[in-house]
Amino acid sequence: MLLVIDVGNTNITLGVFDEDKIVGTYRITTTIPRTSDEFGLLFCDLLHVKGIERTSIDSVIIASVVPAIMYSLTSAIIKYLGITPLIVGAGTKTGIKVLTANAKEVGADRIVDLVAAYEEYGGPVFVIDFGTATTYDLVTEDGKFTAGITSPGIRISANALWNDTAKLPEIEILKPDSILAKDTVSSMQAGLVYGNIGATEYIIKKVKEESKLGSLKVVATGGLGKIIADATDMIDIYDPNLTLKGLRYIYQKNR
C-alpha cells in the first residue's frame, strides 16, 4: 500500500491507497516542533484505527510547504515504517510543465493539485484550493501551468476578524441562510462566506475572459472548499481528496 502525506501550514493530511483506491484518510494539526517518535507513534495509531497494519505500507510520498517539519517527519517514516519516502521537489517527474516566472517558488502542494486535476479531469482546468491561503492555478490543454493567483484563505480572514478586533467573537465558518444578517455571528459568517463566493466567481470570470478558454473546467478542493462549491454554479467539481490523488499520480510517475 502507498501512504501519501500532504504537509500544509495548518494541517497534515494523510491517505492510504491500495492500488488506486483510497482505504483511509487522516488529518492532524501541523504542530511544530514534533519529534520523530511523536510522528511515528501517531502514524502507527492512525493506521491501526482503520485496521491497516504498518507492515502493509510499502511506499511513502510526501509533499510539504513546511520545511521545519521535514527532518522529524522523514526520520519517523524511516524509523517506524522502514521506508525512505519520496519527497516532491525539484527534479520530481510530474507531467506538468511550469511556465510561471519562477518555477522554484511554486509550492509543492499546488503542483500536486494540478497533477491530480489534469489526470482526473483533463485540461484546460482551473484548480482552486481553499486552504490556509486560497490558490487559483491554470493548466492548459497540453499540461502547461501558465498562471496562478493567491489570496488570503477564509480562515486567515476569520482569524484576523477575531484576533485584531476587541469585541468580535471566534465563530464557526458556515454559510448563513441569508446575506441580510441580523446579529454579529451571522454578519461575520455572511461577510466571510458570501465575500469569498463573490471573489471566487469574479476570479473565475476574469480568468476565463483573459485566458480565452471558454471550455475551462473549474475544480475545487480544500477543507472549506465545499462551502463555496455548494454555493456557486461556477465550480464544476469539488474533490476533497484532490491533493492525495495527485501524490499517488506523482509516485507512479517516479517509481
Swiss-Prot record:
It is found in: Cytoplasm. Its EC number is 2.7.1.33. Keywords: ATP-binding, Coenzyme A biosynthesis, Cytoplasm, Kinase, Metal-binding, Nucleotide-binding, Potassium, Transferase. The active site is at D109 (proton acceptor). Homodimer. Catalyzes the phosphorylation of pantothenate (Pan), the first step in CoA biosynthesis. A monovalent cation. Ammonium or potassium. The keyword Lipid metabolism does not apply. It comes from Lachnoclostridium phytofermentans (strain ATCC 700394 / DSM 18823 / ISDg). The lineage of its organism: Bacteria, Bacillati, Bacillota, Clostridia, Lachnospirales. The keyword Nucleotide-binding applies. PANTHER family: TYPE III PANTOTHENATE KINASE. Its cofactor is NH4(+); K(+). CDD domains: ASKHA_NBD_PanK-III. The gene is coaX. This is Type III pantothenate kinase. GO terms for molecular function: ATP binding; metal ion binding; pantothenate kinase activity. It catalyses: (R)-pantothenate + ATP = (R)-4'-phosphopantothenate + ADP + H(+). Belongs to the type III pantothenate kinase family. It holds the Pfam family Pan_kinase. InterPro entries: ATPase_NBD, Type_III_PanK.
